[in-house]
Design a protein with these regions (language model features):
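Hydrophobic positions on the long internal alpha-helix
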Residues: 48, 52-56, 110-111, 179
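C-terminal substrate-binding subdomain of Rossmann-fold SDR/epimerase-dehydratase oxidoreductases
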Residues: 161-163, 169-235
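Glycine-rich NAD(P)-binding loop of the Rossmann-fold in SDR/ketoreductase-type enzymes
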Residues: 22, 36, 40-51, 94, ...
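Active-site Tyr-X1-5-Lys
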Residues: 82-84, 95-123
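SDR active-site strand-loop-helix element
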Residues: 23-29, 71-77, 125-128
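Conserved Rossmann-fold NAD(P)-dependent oxidoreductase catalytic core, especially the SDR/UDP-sugar
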Residues: 50-97
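NAD(P)-dependent short-chain dehydrogenase/reductase
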Residues: 112-167, 173, 177
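NAD(P)H-binding glycine-rich loop region in Rossmannoid oxidoreductase-like domains
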Residues: 6-44
């Protein structure tokens, strides 16, 4: 699928094997990896979006305009950069401070423009950091937010690379699934051409996370969290 659609070859714009009514676009190289591997980050996170939208545009044109799929794109709060106000709303300026954030912001603009032209009907959801994520840790810079909960609960050590005063914005996997389902049924005409939306979440500090874990599982679990500052993540 990747080779057929995303190798920058124009003849593959017509190679989309199916014509879905709704597309949930979740795929990406995660933040830490996108920062360390610049070329791969842009190729996977931005150029694949462009080529997939081109493939859907070809289906739209081939249907004489009848085919207009709904695209739900999982963007990120990484599109924002400081300094931050007390509250961030949908009108806050997008000034990403990472390659990952820049790639997500680029995809938001691509999706908005393809939607403006009527090729697709897209909405970008700026998801909070999903916590607690299941499975193993990945290369996302925010992975530790889940790790300091998930690993200790499984009797494993977890690395905390930032100060406990760090505040972040979280949503659960269940909440994220609900956001996606709701967006799929949303009348985009209500958005007045503002197709990138901030989503609700829980704002808390790392210290508050750890205290919640302590109340739920006890002090012995907290001892499995090791403080190891990491300038790459801190900055």
């Amino acid at each position: 699928m990747y080779n057929r659609l995303f190798n920058r070859c124009p003849r593959y714009y017509h190679a989309c094997p199916i014509a879905p009514d709704i597309v949930f676009h979740l795929a990406s190289i995660v933040s830490g990896e996108a920062e360390s591997n610049f070329d791969a980050g842009w190729q996977v996170n931005m150029f694949t979006m462009w080529h997939y939208l081109e493939a859907l545009k070809a289906l739209h044109i081939g249907s004489n305009g009848a085919y207009v799929p709904k695209i739900i794109f999982t963007s990120s709060i990484a599109v924002f950069g400081g300094p931050f106000p007390e509250q961030i709303d949908d009108t806050f300026l997008s000034v990403p401070q990472t390659s990952y954030g820049a790639q997500k912001a680029s995809c938001e603009l691509l999706l908005s423009d393809f939607s403006r032209k009527g090729f697709v009907d897209g909405i970008s959801l700026r998801l909070p950091t999903i916590c607690v994520r299941p499975g193993k840790a990945n290369l996302a810079a925010s992975s530790f937010f889940s790790g300091i909960i998930r690993e200790p609960l499984n009797g494993q050590k977890a690395i905390l690379p930032v100060d406990e005063s760090v505040r972040h914005w979280h949503a659960s996997p269940r909440a994220a699934a609900g956001f996606l389902r709701h967006a799929a049924t949303l009348d985009s005409g209500l958005l007045e051409n503002r197709r990138a939306l901030n989503l609700p979440g829980v704002s808390c500090t790392v210290a508050e996370q750890i205290e919640a874990l302590r109340r739920a599982a006890g002090q012995s679990v907290i001892k499995l969290i090791e403080r190891q500052p990491d300038d790459t993540i801190i900055n």
